[in-house]
Amino acid sequence: MPIMAGTASPWRREAVFLTAMLVVETSVVGISTLFKFATSKGLNIYPFLGYSYLLASLLLLPSLFFTNRSSSLPPLSVSILSKIGLLGFLGSMYVITGYIGIEYSSPTLASAINNITPALTFILAIIFRMEKVSFKERSSLAKLMGTILSLIGALVVIFYHGPRVFLASSPPYVNFRQFSPPLSSSNSDWLIGGALLTMQGIFVSVSFILQAHIMSVYPAAFRVSFLYTVCVSIVTSTIGLVVEKNNPSVWIIHFDITLITIVTMAIVTSVYYVIHSWTVRHKGPLYLAIFKPLSILIAVVMGAIFLNDSLYLGCLIGGILITLGFYAVMWGKANEEKDQLSFSEKEKTPLLLNRKNDQV
């Protein structure tokens, strides 16, 4: 690609990265919205996940022949395969809890809860002693305060609806029931959905920690992604066969919204991994994270257009708190990495001076 060869102007390079991130966030929210709509037409979650990840793995398969062919890679040992298998199991749990949570609630709630992942990762990193909290450092305080804000925001989104801030009118081409919970029997569904989406966040956080470990010992992003999607397809299909053992007809896919949703999910999943790896390589993980809160706004717009979703005050307040907490955690992580870099440079300076003195 010429744009990445260093010949293009900086603003064009930034435009490419910006467009890629907007495509990723819109696609991820879009598939959640499409899934929510398809469930009303009879889509079952287990065939949806099993077939989608199987097709995604087939789409990722060609990348294995063009990437990670370096001889410096360690052999794909049983230990590494078992860790990727565990990652696939965690991934299966997070997509199952996530999409069932969307069935009970809405893509807007899913997007809001998804943004507490950095806070949950920070908490788990402290529990596993991968992070240390120092009240004397601004970065630690920022991550701590951001975590608290994110968790408060999540509680507000789940437990407080409040009045409607925006009332969506049903589009003429969508004959669909109101998804935002009225203050009646649907409140319990909203709470169940929020609990499942929070569980999804925990699974994602543990997956991030395990994925970072796997990539440190086996830095082959596309190969790991391929094996991961295969594992998720196997695990979700196996669980589905057990859960739906008395209903085998759910595995028959018809040429309707069900097939469209499965194919779209597979394409989004495979493209997401490609753009994710490409962006992290060229811009770093922080750049990728900056765009996550946009998913809340995108979900609100898509929900209003396609699902007749209304926006409640609780979701608005909680979304703002989660976004502030998200950026506080990201700011703390960025400053922590900056401090570590400057500290390592200071350590190198005396060594260089000593070498010069020895040469003299």
UniProtKB/Swiss-Prot annotation:
One of its GO terms (cellular component) is membrane. Keywords: Membrane, Transmembrane, Transmembrane helix. It is a multi-pass membrane protein. One of its GO terms (molecular function) is transmembrane transporter activity. Belongs to the drug/metabolite transporter (DMT) superfamily. Plant drug/metabolite exporter (P-DME) (TC 2.A.7.4) family. Its main location: membrane. The keyword Transmembrane applies. This is WAT1-related protein At3g28070. The lineage of its organism: Eukaryota, Viridiplantae, Streptophyta, Embryophyta, Tracheophyta. It comes from the Eukaryota. InterPro entries: EamA_dom, WAT1-related. It holds the Pfam family EamA. The chain crosses the membrane at residues 15-35, 45-65, 84-104, 108-128, 140-160, 190-210, 224-244, 248-268, 286-306, 311-331. It is found in: Membrane. It comes from Arabidopsis thaliana (Mouse-ear cress). Residues 30-158 form the EamA domain.
